Amino acid sequence: MEKQVYITEEERAKCQKVADAFAELYEMENIMVIDAGRYGFVELKYYKPPHGFEDAITFTDSVALFEELWEEWLNTKLYLMAKGTTLLEKGYKGVFESLPEDKQSELIVRKVDFAKIAEIYM
């Protein structure tokens, strides 16, 4: 019986570049991305001992993985900036909009940086 493959080798290589590009995210948050072989790449989130990760999302498309990890990275950064303040009540969008324009630009430029590292062309 032939096993079904859910991700091409080309896309698997691209997903690995994306996962590697966001290495700093894994240090900031309880998130990791693993290569699950023929199934694609799996984002594991919110580790809670003794049961493990609460959320697992499988990706077979490098652009979708990139966008997911970008959102996680940005939201984590915004949370860390607003932690301990009333800004968090505004949600991530509100926190972002309350930042000075230069800080907003700095965060947005990081998306371009991640895309270059991951070789994702948007």
What are the functions of these language-model segments?
Residues 35-114:
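Acidic, low-complexity, intrinsically disordered interaction modules
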